Amino acid sequence: KYNTWEEICGKGRIIPAFPGVGGSFEENILDAKLTPSIIQATTFGEINGGKSERLLQLASIFKRSYIPYKIEKDMHAWQLCHLAMIVPIADAYYEAGVPEKAGEDRELMRKTAITIKKNLDSLHKLGVTLTPKKMKVLHRLPVQILSIGLRFAFQSEFGNTFMYQHSMKALDEMRALHNQFYGYIGSEEDRN
């Protein structure tokens, strides 16, 4: 999970985290926004799942800064679930004939919804807790409803800022995450 990082930085020095922010550089100026907390607050947690003093201090800093945050008990599961969702979203942009209009392609949104549900199902079968709770909701939603939600998200200002811009400007990163995620699912399924 985080062994390599601990070998590099030292045991007990890592707090796995994920920022609740998105954006991109436009003409050398960073245009970034905090994601709505209902979508994704800045999330962090201890590797062992506990609540340490340093974790509570970090939470206090975010609270005083008015930055939405959430302490997550199992960051490894959280990050896997995040990948289960964002990898197919990025893939949809790359498959679209006109990436900025991906949300208008009903069949592509249906395929994306099916892939997200399949990814979450694979994680669930591997014993990964679906977290945060919205991942359990996505896992249970009918494909038709999820694909409609994706169409709205892809065509929204939110989708442009937090999904499209990152997917298009971080192509190498997203391809690497694609390969790592599906490699992880495949290798874990082979072991079981």
Region annotations inferred by a language model:
Residues 22, 77, 138:
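Positions that flank functional sites
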Residues 117-120, 124-192:
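NAD(P)-dependent Rossmann-like dehydrogenase/reductase catalytic/cofactor-binding core
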